[in-house]
């Protein structure tokens, strides 16, 4: 990419998209196309085709995706919208001779019983976790679209599979948030309760009374003395900061072509931090960072995930990229941002 290359970020309002936009601007790229959902419905094939024909982007970061806790609540919407929007963008990128595209897969698209840390060759080697099918299956389809378009049409579309993503602009709503931001907010609110900082609690929750706030937080196992976490806490996870993923994305866009990985079985790239820890270890790390002095209670009578998710990112590391932000540092950055926001 040159500094004046025409770059399109699909999904620029998401956690990754925002980090990419900042990273590209800081690197001097100035010809960046951004369209929100009101301006461009990515599920609508005609609109996407018209957009690509009119704008002629040279480089595409396909970050857009419908997220809903892996599609547990709206699986039909998740599988339909994600399948359509990625197919529309990949096809239009081919038709309009996009020089390079990066698509994003997910660790949840790997089989439920894949051996950890999971290598790229594990894709399609077994069944997905049933809870992850609505989100994971479109990711597999997008991955294979990129590979087969490359082989048939000589495009240069690369897929990156990411570990659990976190960052400053992630979702903190306790009903929707993923494990890391949910824990961060729970411990923060428990700390405020313990310190009797009523005004800060009400401002954070946008509520009018302490009784209302306490009743709401009790539903999520949060009080001034303890934070309850569902399950045993023994499940192992890996996390990558959005700034690191943005950095990896730009590195791949500038330095790695499909021909560099085409000979591999399953020619895509895992992107992870290589830091593996249990949910229990994560909880105590966040507890210490936030400064909550109460207890952590693991309720093993509640539903628990037994599926560890760790990625083998050695293929990308051997091609020259390594992460920069360790987990503790990343959580501290995230918490500082949350306090200011």
Regions found by a protein language model. Give the residues of each.
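C-terminal substrate-binding subdomain of Rossmann-fold SDR/epimerase-dehydratase oxidoreductases
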Residues: 11, 19-23, 189-341
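Active-site Tyr-X1-5-Lys
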Residues: 130-163, 182-199
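N-terminal Rossmann NAD(P)H-binding glycine-rich loop of SDR-like oxidoreductase domains
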Residues: 2-26
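Adenosine-cofactor binding site in Rossmann-like domains, unifying the SAM/SAH pocket
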Residues: 31-48
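NAD(P)H-binding glycine-rich loop region in Rossmannoid oxidoreductase-like domains
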Residues: 46-82, 112
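SDR active-site strand-loop-helix element
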Residues: 10, 35, 60-66, 101-107, ...
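Glycine-rich NAD(P)-binding loop of the Rossmann-fold in SDR/ketoreductase-type enzymes
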Residues: 43, 77-85, 129, 133, ...
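Conserved Rossmann-fold NAD(P)-dependent oxidoreductase catalytic core, especially the SDR/UDP-sugar
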Residues: 3, 87-133, 158-160
């Amino acid at each position: 990419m040159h500094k004046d290359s025409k770059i399109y970020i699909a999904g620029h309002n998401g956690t990754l998209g925002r980090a990419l936009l900042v990273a590209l601007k800081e690197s001097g790229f100035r010809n960046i196309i951004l369209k929100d959902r009101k301006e461009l419905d990515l599920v609508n094939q005609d609109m996407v085709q018209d957009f690509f024909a009119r704008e002629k982007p040279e480089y595409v970061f396909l970050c857009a995706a419908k997220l809903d806790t892996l599609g547990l609540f709206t699986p039909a919407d998740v599988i339909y919208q994600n399948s359509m929007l990625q197919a529309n963008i990949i096809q239009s990128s081919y038709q309009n001779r996009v020089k390079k595209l990066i698509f994003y897969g997910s660790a949840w698209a790997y089989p439920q019983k894949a051996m950890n840390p999971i290598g790229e060759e594990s894709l399609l080697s077994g069944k997905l976790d049933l809870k992850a099918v609505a989100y994971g299956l479109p990711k597999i389809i997008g991955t294979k679209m990129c590979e087969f378009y490359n082989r048939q049409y000589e495009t240069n579309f690369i897929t990156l599979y990411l570990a659990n993503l976190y960052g400053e602009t992630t979702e903190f709503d306790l009903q929707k948030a993923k494990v890391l931001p949910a824990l961060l907010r729970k411990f923060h609110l428990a700390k405020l309760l313990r310190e009797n900082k009523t005004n800060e609690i009400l401002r954070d929750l946008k509520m009018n009374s302490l009784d209302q706030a306490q009743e709401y937080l009790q539903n999520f196992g949060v009080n001034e003395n303890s934070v309850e976490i569902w399950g045993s806490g023994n499940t192992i996870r890996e996390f990558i900061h959005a700034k690191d993923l943005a950095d990896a994305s730009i590195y791949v866009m500038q330095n790695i072509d499909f021909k560099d990985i085409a000979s591999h079985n399953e020619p895509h790239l895992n992107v992870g931090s290589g830091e593996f820890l249990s949910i229990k270890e994560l909880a105590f790390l966040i507890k210490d960072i936030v400064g909550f002095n109460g207890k952590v209670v693991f309720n093993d009578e509640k539903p628990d995930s037994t599926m560890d998710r760790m990625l083998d990112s050695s293929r990308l590391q051997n091609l020259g990229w390594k992460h920069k932000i360790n987990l503790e540092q990343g959580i501290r950055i995230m918490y500082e941002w949350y306090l200011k926001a």
